[in-house]
Every structure is written in C-alpha cells, then in structure tokens.
C-alpha cells in the first residue's frame, strides 16, 4: 500500500514538475480579436475596444493642424493616425498639449518648459541630456533637519547641525568628442563614455571601462563581439556567450549582455536571446544612421518618427542589418510595416527564420508595448532641409513612400500574415505545440497514477 502511495505521489506531483518546460504561446491578434498591445501589421490595438482595428486613414501631406485624425491625441504619420499621447520630444510635432512629454504644445511644436527643467532625457532636445545637481547647505539657523550630536571624550557638548538637501535637474548640452564624461548619457549622439572619455560608438576595446544600459546598437560602447559586463573591477567591455541557458520563470533572469533577454526557445528551454545582430554590417549601418540623425537634429532610433521622416533609407538599412529575426515576431512586424513600408512583405509560411528575416526585419522591443505609442514625430526636418540641399530632398521623397495603398494592401493580407507569424513564433520564441503535448502527457500520467492506486 505504501508503495502505491509512493507511485501516486511520484507520478502526480514529482514527474510533471521534473518534466515541465517553459511555455510561450505568443501570437499576433488579427482584426477584431482581443489585444493588450500588439496586433498584426496593419492593425492597431484600440484601447477603448480592447481589440485589433484598422488604422484610421489620413493624409500626411496636410499640415499637422489640419489633419483629419478624429481621436484626441492621434497624429497623422505615414498616412495613418497613430496614438501619440505624451510621447513627443521637444521640437517634435504636436496638435495639443497632451501630445508632448512636457505638456506644452505651441505652434504645433512641443516646447521645453520655462527654465528647461526636466526629469528624464526624453524631456530635453536631442542634443541635450537631463543633468541633476544635488544641492546641500549647512547652517545654524532653523531648517528642515536638525541633528543633535552628543560627544563624550570625556567632556560633553551638544551641537545643533542643520542640513538642507535638494536637487535641480535641467537640460544640459551634451559633451563633444574627447570630452571627459561620467555617464554615456552626457555624450553627444553617436558617442559613448568609454574610459571616461566621450568616444565613437563601437570603439570600446576589450577591458575598456564602460557604462551598461545601451539598449540599442546606436548607443553601443563596446566593439563587435563585446558587451558592457560587470566584473571585479566594475563594468568593462567583455566577450559574452550567445544563447546561454537561463530560467524565464526567475524574477530576474540573468543574461550577460545588455542586448539579451531570457526567452523560451523552440525546445521549450530558456535561453538568452538577443534582439540584435551585432555584426560589422550592423556597426556600419548604425554609424550611418547616427550621422543622418545628427544632421537632422533627430534621435537615431527605429522607434522615432523623426528618423523615419528624415532618414528612412538609413533607418531601413539599420533595421535589416541590426534587428534579429526573432524581434519581428514579438512586435508583430509593426515596426517594419510603419517605418519601412516599401521593404515590408508577408513572410513565407514555413520558411526558416534565417531565410525570411533578411527581407523583413523589424524593431524590437522587449520592454515596448506598441511601437507607435513610444514613437515620436518632428518638424525639425523643415528647418534643416534648406541647409541639407538635395540630400534632404531625396530623403524627403523617400519618406513619402508610406502611402495609403501600401497600408491597405498590407491590411488586406493580414490573415495570411498571421498564420505565418504563428509559425515563426513557434520556431523563434517557443513551441506552443510542445506545451500542448506536455499537458496531454500530464493527463495520461494522472490516469496511470489513479489506476495504480486502485489496483
């Protein structure tokens, strides 16, 4: 009888625990399906209806104040209305105060608040960062904090000490090349703080000191094959292991690279997966995107619509060369669909991630919800086009390619797209079928356990 009880406990509790694997049943919702953030390319997650709906069409050629977007907080970009609520950087386009991070829209441009006060870098213009200065004063006059100090050596005295602490955060100009730095945020676009000096991105050699948190290749301090890792002497550029094992169920899964996160792989195991292809091609494309963005006073990021408008060619090359195939699945192809509609095409069903990704890479984002929500749009191009001559005109003509026809054609084919996304999702981000098999096997084990217990 005891042996039967042991078998029952083993099969019902221990064996399923030992055989369990991580699960990832991610798929891209289609039209009218429930959504929480992402939808299939060509659709937007309507927060009011909590379902995937088609983008509202509009005319990007119209002045911002005259666009036809019916919902508050929406702006016309690439001929569709996108939700830009409280996400716009200073100098970016806006229609009302709620469009701007600093809640100040004047003349259809997001403005910096008086005094240039800030809380984050995104509240400053692209050539500035939010610098915080801590202020401390001491006096004998009454104030906010009084510390009575008593010392017996052998005499006793009581000394009132008044301490007043505060901080001031203001937008400060970023540091130029070869300037002394203490954080990478303080360096100009295209530079990173390496060995305490503002240096070009991707220039950090092995063991060079660096600062972590470079979430995009356009901010990478370390050269190809290296990542900013913590060691005995602090953070420095070190080689890192691709696809190391990890446990997605951990509260803080450990991956030894800023560009990696712990995800389920096709075998139901946890592995550190990167959203970027940190290769020499990516390094070259990142530098070209940075140069273009700097010339247009925009931010070199695939989530920034200033970049999409001003540097579409460089942005799409960056997307193809730097974004890993896995990212296109987790973002439902929306970044590529909106940023590079001329490059967007339906993935082939059953194709491997390596063969289909070269023509349809997309943006990441592991901690992003909807790419459009965190995107930004700017009119800085209008002031810079006159100084950039024909190059500006050519880029401007490229940015007009996101026509409503491309939006409609991609929307019409979203059903085929979704089935292929599910297939890609199985291969790249986890195997839902394996989790289903696991559930069935657990049920069979439970039945066997009951039979053994009865007989």
Swiss-Prot record:
Keyword match Lipid metabolism: no
Residue ranges of the propeptide: 434-455
Biased composition range(s): Low complexity: 351-423
Region (Disordered): 349-434
Localization terms from the record: Cell membrane
Signal peptide range in chain numbering: 1-21
GO terms, biological process: cell differentiation; cellular response to starvation
Domain of life: Eukaryota
Lipid moiety-binding residues (GPI-like-anchor amidated serine): 433
Role, per record: Plays a role in differentiation.
Additional notes on this entry: Overexpression rather impaired the progression of differentiation. Antisense RNA-mediated dia1 inactivation was found to enhance the initial step of cell differentiation.
Name of this protein: Differentiation-associated protein 1
Gene responsible for this protein: dia1
């Amino acid at each position: 009888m005891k042996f039967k009880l042991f078998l029952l406990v083993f099969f019902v509790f221990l064996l399923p625990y030992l055989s369990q694997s991580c699960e990832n049943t991610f798929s891209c919702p289609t039209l009218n399906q429930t959504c929480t953030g992402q939808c299939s390319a060509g659709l937007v997650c309507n927060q009011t209806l909590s379902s995937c709906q088609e983008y509202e069409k509009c005319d990007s050629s119209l002045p911002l104040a005259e666009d036809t977007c019916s919902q508050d907080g929406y702006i016309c970009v690439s001929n569709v209305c996108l939700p830009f609520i409280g996400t716009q950087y200073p100098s970016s386009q806006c229609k009302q105060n709620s469009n701007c991070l600093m809640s100040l829209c004047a003349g259809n441009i997001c403005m910096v608040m008086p005094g240039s006060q800030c809380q984050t870098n995104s509240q400053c213009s692209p050539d500035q960062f939010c610098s915080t200065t801590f202020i401390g004063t001491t006096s004998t006059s009454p104030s906010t904090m009084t510390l009575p100090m008593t010392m017996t050596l052998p005499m006793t005295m009581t000394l009132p000490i008044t301490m007043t602490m505060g901080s001031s955060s203001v937008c400060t100009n970023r540091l130029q090349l070869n300037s002394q730095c203490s954080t990478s945020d303080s360096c100009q676009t295209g530079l990173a703080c390496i060995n305490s000096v503002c240096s070009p991105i991707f220039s950090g050699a092995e063991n060079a000191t660096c600062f972590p948190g470079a979430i995009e290749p356009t901010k990478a301090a370390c050269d190809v094959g290296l990542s900013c890792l913590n060691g005995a002497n602090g953070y420095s550029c070190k080689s890192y292991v691709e696809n190391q094992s990890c446990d997605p169920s951990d509260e803080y899964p450990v991956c030894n690279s800023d560009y990696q996160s712990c995800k389920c792989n096709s075998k139901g195991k946890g592995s550190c997966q990167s959203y970027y292809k940190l290769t020499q091609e990516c390094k070259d494309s990142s530098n070209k995107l940075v140069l273009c963005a700097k010339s247009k006073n925009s931010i070199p990021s695939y989530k920034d619509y200033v970049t999409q408008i001003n540097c579409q060619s460089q942005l799409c090359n960056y997307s193809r060369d730097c974004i890993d195939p896995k990212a296109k699945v987790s973002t439902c192809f929306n970044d590529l669909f909106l940023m590079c509609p001329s490059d967007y095409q339906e993935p082939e069903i059953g194709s491997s991630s390596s063969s289909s990704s070269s023509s349809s890479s997309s943006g990441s984002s592991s901690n992003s919800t909807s790419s459009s929500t965190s995107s930004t749009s700017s009119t800085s191009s209008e002031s810079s086009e006159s100084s950039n001559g024909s190059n500006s005109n050519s880029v401007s003509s490229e940015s007009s390619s996101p026509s409503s026809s491309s939006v409609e054609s991609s929307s019409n084919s979203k059903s085929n797209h979704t089935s292929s996304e599910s297939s890609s999702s199985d291969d790249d981000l986890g195997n839902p079928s394996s989790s289903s098999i696991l559930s069935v096997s657990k049920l069979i084990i439970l039945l066997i356990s009951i039979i053994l217990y009865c007989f």
